[in-house]
Amino acid sequence: MKIYVDADACPVKDVIIFEATKAEIPVILVTSFSHYSNAEQPKGVETIYVDSGADAADYRIMQLAQKEDLIVTQDYGLASLALAKGCIVLHHKGYKYTNENIEQLLQTRYLSAMVRKSGKRTKGPKPFTAEDKEKFRALFKSMIAL
């Protein structure tokens, strides 16, 4: 198992790196050049930089990921593709994407896009909380223990 992180706006990178390093599972952070950092990462953590174009990180993750790898993303499109490839996919707010819930999530995203296209506003996501982070930590630890 390897862990791929859609890292541009991921608020749980520290949790992923800490827990995966303890478990000696490789972590690959995929991020755009616009988020370049000289920060040194622990052994077993690699950063791959991609162009800043839309979905560039998603395409790179899908190119690299194999069946049973774990992917952390908030992108429903990437989650859907990764599930079809046989990957385990988690959202940073502490829930697991499944074949049962992804269709509803994609449908909701589509309907919200249509509302915005018509000139109306939609509610954004709720703020990320410390409770969300702990929920993610518990789920993540259970997934890497499998």
Swiss-Prot record:
InterPro entries registered for this protein in UniProt: UPF0178 (IPR003791)
PANTHER family, per database record: UPF0178 PROTEIN YAII
Record-linked NCBIfam families: PRK00124.1
Similarity comment: family membership: Belongs to the UPF0178 family.
Alphabetical list of HAMAP family matching this protein: UPF0178 (MF_00489)
Protein's name in the database: UPF0178 protein BA_3063/GBAA_3063/BAS2849
Lineage: Bacteria, Bacillati, Bacillota, Bacilli, Bacillales
